[in-house]
Regions:
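Short, aromatic/basic amphipathic alpha-helical patches
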Residues: 86-98
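Conserved P-loop NTPase motor cores
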Residues: 47-66, 82, 96, 100-189
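P-loop NTPase motor core of the ASCE superfamily
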Residues: 38, 42-54, 60, 140, ...
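A broad, low-specificity signal for short, low-complexity segments enriched in glycine/proline
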Residues: 7-11, 36-41, 111-114, 131-136
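N-terminal secretory signal sequences
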Residues: 4, 21, 35-36, 58, ...
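Short, surface-exposed beta-edge/turn micro-motifs
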Residues: 73, 111, 209-211
Length: 255
């Protein structure tokens, strides 16, 4: 029986959808290929770093900035949406001179790495129509033109505005919990589930702490790599970040 043109196109669409489903399943089920951290970071680009508390998300972002500075001579902006002057000065004294702490997006430089720590504070899904969110959308849209690498740090994507999620070129996980995959956005649940299983399969807390799972959204596939903390990372630096988070929670900032 000869297919009519309409039926033929319908079958093509079914095959196309099946092919896309196979590509999706292959990416989820395949073993992540091993790469170096620097090789998988896009420049310019937008990277989202997610995972449980105290798993090294901020330390990872600082290592990426260190790599980009040593290889490309890029300065870095450490953007903290809510930080008092006392903590800002303390932080600035510890980090390298080529990294500047700011609370204002107007101070983001061209051709730089921008670390947006606890991005959910001002890129929250519930605030998607606010002036802050609209301004952030505009900055993401021109990140390529301004030659910026923007690193968003958050526990999981459900906290973030959808426009931020769709702008990313890479997603990097540091060990998530089962709750993270359970309460993720529907679009991200399978990916976070894979991340949970990936880290569960790594023996030893030290090995888990070093490991990263990376989703390449441009080529749609998973990679794995290890990271280490940059030379300036100390317990004091970690405590400052924790104090800022506690301070913001007491002020009623949504995290």
């Amino acid at each position: 029986m000869k297919l009519t043109p309409k039926e033929s196109q319908t079958n093509k669409l079914k095959k196309y959808r099946q092919q896309k489903s196979e590509e999706y399943a292959r990416a989820i089920m395949s073993t992540p290929k091993k790469v170096s951290l620097y090789s998988i970071i896009p420049y310019p680009g937008v990277v989202m770093i997610m995972g449980d508390i105290r798993t090294g998300k901020t330390g990872l972002a600082h290592e990426i900035a260190s790599e980009m500075h040593s290889r490309r001579r890029l300065p870095a902006i450490l953007h903290m949406p809510r930080m008092d002057e006392k903590h800002r000065r303390s932080l600035q004294r510890i980090i390298p001179s080529w990294m500047k702490v700011t609370t204002k997006r107007s101070q983001w430089k061209d051709r730089a790495v921008v670390i947006y720590d606890e991005a959910a504070q001002s890129a929250h899904a519930r605030r998607s129509q606010s002036g802050d969110a609209i301004e952030l959308d505009d900055l993401l849209a021109i990140a390529g033109q301004r030659e910026q690498l923007i690193l968003f740090i958050s526990h999981y994507s459900r906290k973030l505005d959808l426009n931020v999620c769709t702008s990313v070129h890479r997603i990097i996980w540091k060990r998530p919990t089962y709750a993270h995959q359970l309460w993720e956005r529907d679009e991200m649940a399978d990916f976070t589930g894979k991340a949970y299983d990936f880290f569960k399969g790594i023996k030893g807390r030290v090995a888990q702490k070093k490991a990263c799972l990376v989703l390449d959204m441009e080529n749609f596939g998973f990679c794995q790599c290890n990271n280490k903390l940059p030379p300036w990372w100390t317990d004091r630096l970690s405590r400052i970040f924790k104090e800022v988070q506690i301070q913001n929670s007491r002020r009623g900032v949504i995290l």
